[in-house]
A protein has these predicted regions:
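N-terminal regulatory/sensing modules of transcriptional regulators
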Residues: 1-151
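Basic, Lys/Arg-enriched C-terminal extension of HTH/homeodomain DNA-binding domains
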Residues: 201-222
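Hydrophobic aliphatic residue packing
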Residues: 31-34, 106, 168, 181, ...
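Residues within the DNA-recognition helix of helix-turn-helix
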Residues: 195-198
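Helix-turn-helix DNA-binding segment
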Residues: 152-191
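Hydrophobic residues on short alpha-helical segments
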Residues: 166-170, 200, 212
Length: 222
């Protein structure tokens, strides 16, 4: 027997299907967790699994994460990059990984006391950094955000540092003295000192050694 649908009934059916699809989309904000420590990954999973609006996946290494990102297409990536802070040379693997993250909001955390900030420090428009001890606060905030608010995190590329601060920082990391940096950039010694002070204040560290530790990770972002 043929069932005749009124225009009102058909409209209700179509609208209900649209809302079901929207609800399905909202309930699947994707988060990728990367940490070699099984217990950390398990703890993050357990905490975030309390939220029905999140779809989680975890891997132990940056190398595995690179292929997972292409597959999973996460909107948020939470990654422990402490081991790469100890590598002062060029690291193609880390550089490639960070390039693959360009469509996600990335939170880098470190097994260190610094950065000395209770909230993530935005290095660029999409990448922030924090000390691991503040990871619980980050997870708490992530468990409350919706799919749409997650998308809003993706903003235009920006930098925490000015172009001249970048140049000063690069020379500083090579242990170049202030007078030589000043000569190269055609600025005064006092301006170099001022830039160094602003750099450490922005990244929330106390000295060159702490900055160098973090710099080994974020130098690939600029």
């Amino acid at each position: 027997e043929l069932t005749l649908w009124s225009s009102e009934d058909y409209l209700i059916l179509v609208c209900s299907q649209v809302w079901l699809q929207l609800d399905k989309d909202v309930c699947h904000m994707k988060i990728l967790i990367i940490d070699e420590c099984f217990y950390t990954r398990s703890g993050v999973n357990t905490y975030l699994n309390n939220s029905t609006s999140l779809n989680l996946r975890d891997v132990p290494t940056v190398e595995q994460a690179t292929s997972t990102i292409q597959d999973f297409n996460p909107e948020i990536i939470i990654v422990n990059l402490t081991q790469y802070c100890r590598f002062g040379g060029h690291c193609p693997l880390l550089e490639h990984f960070l390039r693959c993250c360009d469509q996600a909001k990335v939170y880098i955390y470190l097994d260190a006391a610094y950065p000395f900030s209770e909230t993530p420090i935005p290095l660029t428009g999409s990448v922030s950094i924090l000390a691991k001890k503040h990871l619980p606060e980050l997870l708490q905030s992530l468990s409350r955000i919706s799919h749409d608010s997650g998308k809003s995190h993706l903003s235009c590329p920006a930098s925490l540092f000015s172009p001249q601060e970048h140049k000063v920082m690069c020379y500083w990391m090579t242990e170049m003295p202030n007078y030589r940096i000043a000569k190269k950039l055609n600025i005064s010694d006092s301006t170099v000192y001022s830039h160094k002070r602003h750099i450490t204040e922005k990244i929330k560290v106390r000295n060159r050694l702490e900055l160098c530790f973090i710099y080994n990770v974020f130098k690939y972002l600029y």
